[in-house]
Amino acid sequence: MQVKELTKQYDGKTVVDSVTFAIPKGKVLSLIGPNGAGKSTVMGIISRLIARDAGLVDFEGRDIAKWKSKELSKRLAILTQSNSIQMKLTVRELVTFGRFPYSGGRTTPEDQRIIDQAIAYMELEEFQDRFIDELSGGQRQRALIATSIRCGCIVTRNHTELGRV
């Protein structure tokens, strides 16, 4: 992913000013800075929840705005700071949701294999049948990461999230 000259203003005040960075495939980048520095705005633009005023977000050679949502959801996952889950789900059920863009809700043996791999990778095997609300904060975060790694790309809104895992 490449972000080039990204700019955003609210009511004439620049909150993101010509931000440029690249995230090479397989690498992680943390956006750090004080409150109000524009980190959440940058992530909102990358996730297409906030319109940019100028600049480019290039993902796999295409402007992120030109991706169809269904196609993009297979390649890009967003983890947010607030991760409250309002449904009574087990870890396995939550991770299965990560395959929805691929399976349309009808998981195949290949989907199950990928779900098993994600659970194992995040060391959640012993918790996979527990409900999310029964887990510690770190275990819950690992389950959310397992849900996201199904596409091989994780973008996180909070640089401390991965450090807590």
Where are these regions (language model features)?
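ABC ATPase NBD coupling module
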Residues: D63-A77, S82, G105-T108, Q112
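Conserved ABC ATPase signature
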Residues: T107, F131-L135, Q139
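Conserved structural motif at the start of ABC-family nucleotide-binding domains
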Residues: M1, V16-S18
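The feature captures the beta-strand-to-loop junction immediately N-terminal to the Walker
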Residues: I32-P34
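Signature (C-motif/LSGGQ) region and adjacent switch/coupling loops
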Residues: M87, Q128-D129
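Conserved ABC ATPase "signature" region
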Residues: T96, P109-F127
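Helix-to-loop junction immediately C-terminal to a conserved catalytic motif
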Residues: S47
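Conserved ABC transporter NBD signature motif
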Residues: G55-D63
